[in-house]
A protein has these predicted regions:
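Conserved, mostly hydrophobic/aromatic
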Residues: 15, 33, 44, 110, ...
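Hydrophobic faces of well-ordered beta-strands that scaffold small-molecule active sites
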Residues: 13-17, 41-43, 89-93, 118-120, ...
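N-terminal amphipathic alpha-helix/helix-capping segment at the start of soluble metabolic enzymes
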Residues: 1-16, 79-83, 254
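Glycine-enriched alpha-helix->loop->beta-strand junction motifs that scaffold or abut catalytic
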Residues: 37-39, 110-116, 135-142, 159-167, ...
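Catalytic cores of alpha/beta
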Residues: 23-33, 149-159, 201, 205-221
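Glycine-rich phosphate-binding active-site loops on the catalytic face of alpha/beta enzymes
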Residues: 39-50, 115-119, 124, 169-175, ...
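Active-site-adjacent beta->alpha loops and helix N-cap segments on the catalytic face
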Residues: 2-8, 48-57, 69-79, 99-105, ...
Length: 254
C-alpha cells in the first residue's frame, strides 16, 4: 500500500486546544507537511502513559488530554483532512486507547474516515494477533516495529509485517539524538530478505544530515519530536516553521 516512494513521514501530535484558531492551525500543519514533501502522515492519539515517547511527545500527549482531545475528535480531524489529503495516514497510539474504544469499533471507524493503518508500540509481536485480525478485516495495516535485536527476531517479525516496517534506530524512547549508531543497513537487509516491504527509520532523527544518512540505507525516515517541538515552541504560528523544516528534510533525501 505504501509503495516505494516512501521517504519523509512527519509525526504530528495535536495539542488539544479547542479554539477555532488552534483547529485551523492543526489542519494547516498537516497540509503544510504534505505540500512540502511528506509522503505519509502519522497522527498521534493521546494516551496518559505513552511509554515509547520521550519528554517532548509525552508533554504533547498531556496537553492534548488536558485540552479535551478525544479519539472521536481525532477521527473527525481525519475525516476533514481527507477532503484533500491523499497521502497515506496512520495512527500512532497505545493498546489501551484501542481497547477502551473497542477494537472492532476503532478499526471500523478508522477505515470509514480514511486511515490506512496504525502503530501500537506497546503491543509485542506475540500479542498482536487480536489487533491484526480486526485491522485486516477493515483494510488497515498494523505496522510492525523492529528494534535492534537478534537476527532471528527481526526475521520473525519481518515475515508477518504489513504496510511498512518501522525500524527503531535506537533503544529507548523517542526524541532527538545527536548521533545514531545502530547499523540500520544491516537491519533493513534482514527485513528485505524475508519480505519485499518498505522500511522507514524513526526514533531520534531530527536533522537533514541524519535524514540523508538514514534514507540512504532505508526507504524512508520518520520525524517526530522535532516537529512536535516546533508546534510547542511556536504555537499557532508554527505552520511556516513546519513548512521550512519538512522541506529541508525532504531536500536532504531527494
Amino acid at each position: 500500500m505504501f509503495g516505494k516512494t516512501l521517504k519523509t513521514i512527519p509525526k504530528v501530535i495535536h495539542t488539544g486546544r479547542t479554539r477555532l484558531r488552534a483547529e485551523r492551525t492543526r489542519f494547516a500543519a498537516v497540509r503544510a507537511a504534505v505540500a512540502n514533501g511528506a509522503d505519509l502522515i502519522e497522527l498521534g492519539i493521546p494516551f496518559s502513559d505513552p511509554t515509547a515517547e520521550g519528554p517532548v511527545i509525552q508533554g504533547a500527549n498531556i496537553r492534548a488530554l488536558s485540552g479535551g482531545v478525544t479519539t472521536d475528535k481525532i477521527f473527525d480531524l481525519v475525516r476533514d483532512l481527507r477532503t484533500d489529503i491523499t497521502v497515506p495516514m496512520v495512527f500512532m497510539t497505545y493498546a489501551n486507547v484501542v481497547f477502551s474504544y473497542g477494537i472492532e469499533r476503532f478499526c471500523k471507524r478508522a477505515a470509514e474516515v480514511g486511515m490506512d493503518g496504525m502503530i501500537l508500540p506497546d503491543v509485542p509481536f506475540e500479542e498482536k494477533e487480536e489487533f491484526a485480525f480486526v485491522a485486516e478485516k477493515y483494510g488497515l495495516d498494523l505496522i510492525s516495529l523492529i528494534a535492534p535485536t537478534s537476527h532471528e527476531r527481526i526475521s520473525m517479525i519481518a515475515k508477518e509485517a504489513e504496510g511498512f516496517v518501522y525500524c527503531v534506530s535506537s533503544l529507548g524512547v523517542t526524541g532527538m539524538r545527536s548521533q545514531i549508531t545502530t547499523d540500520i543497513g544491516a537491519m533493513v537487509e534482514l527485513v528485505k530478505a524475508q519480505k519485499d516491504i518498505p522500511c522507514a527509520v524513526g526514533f531520534g532523527i531530527s536533522t537533514p544530515e541524519q535524514a540523508k544518512k538514514m534514507a540512504a540505507q532505508a526507504d524512508g525516515v520518520i520525524v517526530g519530536s522535532a516537529i512536535v517541538k516546533l508546534c510547542e515552541t511556536h504555537g499557532a504560528d508554527c505552520v511556516p516553521y513546519i513548512k521550512e523544516y519538512v522541506k529541508s528534510m525532504k531536500d536532504a533525501i531527494r
